[in-house]
Curated annotation (Swiss-Prot):
It comes from Thermoanaerobacter sp. (strain X514). One of its GO terms (cellular component) is cytosolic large ribosomal subunit. This protein binds to the 23S rRNA, and is important in its secondary structure. It is located near the subunit interface in the base of the L7/L12 stalk, and near the tRNA binding site of the peptidyltransferase center. It comes from the Bacteria. Gene3D superfamilies: Ribosomal protein L6, alpha-beta domain. Belongs to the universal ribosomal protein uL6 family. GO terms for molecular function: rRNA binding; structural constituent of ribosome. Keywords: Ribonucleoprotein, Ribosomal protein, RNA-binding, rRNA-binding. The keyword Glycoprotein does not apply. InterPro entries: Ribosomal_uL6-like, Ribosomal_uL6-like_a/b-dom_sf, Ribosomal_uL6_a/b-dom, Ribosomal_uL6_bac-type. Pfam families: Ribosomal_L6 (PF00347). This is Large ribosomal subunit protein uL6.
Length: 180
């Protein structure tokens, strides 16, 4: 059995988990509601204030989906209670971020500012002009929006300029050594 998959998920107070016969899991909490459909190769049941995930067979695909399904449901429960956040920092002279209504405007060395629209269920906060925080209840969406922001100007390998995750270490390459 999958080591992660066999662990039951405790349902905290104030969280409601429903599973339909066609494997659609709905998690309701104080921060919102999440819904996701899972493949029929896993069984999901709610009993004794716990969510238990089991698999129907022992194929390689079923074993993989067992742990994955359990981890996704655990993240859904955590999302509706605590939420998720990802922080990014902007490094570089003249590089800055600003919030204009529901848009994030990035000035990161291009001839034009780059605008990123705020998606439903995702909140983008700008602290100062070089720190961006992405918050939401869906871990997958928070990570994807943060990755899209980072992709606008990835950290440069020679000077380290660009947008990076908070705490990300960028290894700098050595520049050319000129002839003497």
């Amino acid at each position: 059995m999958s080591r992660i998959g066999r662990l039951p998920i405790e349902i905290p107070k104030g969280v409601e988990v429903k599973v339909t016969p066609d494997n659609v899991v709905t998690v309701k909490g104080s921060k919102g509601t999440l819904e996701k459909k899972f493949p029929p190769i896993v069984n999901i049941e709610v009993k004794d204030n716990q969510v238990i995930v089991t698999r129907k067979g022992d194929d390689k695909e079923e074993k993989a989906m067992h742990g994955t399904t359990r981890a996704i449901i655990a993240n859904m429960v955590k999302g509706v209670t605590e939420g998720f956040e990802k922080a990014l920092e902007i490094v570089g002279i003249g590089y800055r971020a600003a919030k204009q209504g529901k848009k994030l405007v990035l000035n990161v060395g291009y001839s034009h500012p780059v605008e990123i629209e705020e998606k439903p269920g995702i909140e983008i906060i700008v602290e100062g002009n070089n720190k961006i925080i992405v918050r939401g209840i869906d871990k997958e969406k928070v990570g994807q929006v943060a990755a899209n922001i980072r992709r606008v100007r990835e950290p440069d390998a020679y000077q380290g300029k660009g947008i990076r995750y908070a705490g990300e270490v960028v290894r700098l390459k050595e520049g050319k050594t000129g002839k003497k």
